[in-house]
Amino acid sequence: MEIIMQTAQYIIELLKAVFLGIVEGITEWLPISSTGHLILVNEFLNLRQSKDFIDMFNIVIQLGAILAVMVIYFKRLNPFQPGKTAREVQLTWKLWLKVVIACIPSAFFGLLLDDWMEAHLSNFFVVAIMLVVYGIAFIWIEDRNRRVDPKVTDLARMSYKTAFYIGLFQVLSIIPGTSRSGATILGGIIVGTSRSVAADFTFFLGIPTMFGYSGLKAVKYFIDGNTLTGGQAAILLVASVTAFLVSLFVIRFLMNYIKKHDFTVFGKYRIVLGIIVLFYGAVKLIFG
């Protein structure tokens, strides 16, 4: 009987992992904060694992999401792709250089501030505030953007300086509730790129950023003396694979969506969710 109960509990944990993978796959690419959503969802799902594992889990499952970008854009990102002309190969290498340049600010500040941010800003109130602040920012920027034509409508024409500026905006995503994609897309629009260019560059910028951050979290997890059981590895794998599969659809959806729409709806969603999170955090603080 005990074995049956343990098996049932393990299956439930795997189902929770599937659900969290779905949440990650959706929210990683939409500018609504994947980490903020995972923190909130896990509050109710109550994944029965240690806090250290959950903190690592929330970051490492992003690898599944970023693999979707590599699959969808493989030909475009691969400088060794058969059939590419010399000009196309050159543009691909230049694209990667722009990505590397954009990664520099977040790599520096991420290593410098990650532990402090996690210790002091990983709470409901910070998540709620950042959801609302960026929600308002999206609505305001999109309203302004209707009267301004983008300066950069082709990623190949985006300068290295513009790439660096977008990288500076990515630094803001260190704060929980901000959204990495939200910060970089908003930053791209502010510095003059079209929505599609900002979204494309956000996807590409996520490859080294998310691989690096996930690797850092995994290394810290083991350095702190934690181990990974077979069950935990399975939970991590199931969530990552789910995030990968869902991301394949979400990325394509977003790129089709922004051809005819702006990001205002996501701004409104962030504000509503931020208010809900703030209310929930206040209730939890008062009543425990």
From Swiss-Prot:
Membrane topology value: Multi-pass membrane protein
Keyword Membrane: yes
Entry EC no(s): 3.6.1.27
Record bears the keyword Lipid metabolism: no
Cellular component annotations (GO), alphabetically ordered: plasma membrane
NCBIfam families given in the database record: PRK00281.1-2, PRK00281.1-4, PRK00281.1-5, undec_PP_bacA
Name this protein carries in UniProt: Undecaprenyl-diphosphatase
Gene: uppP
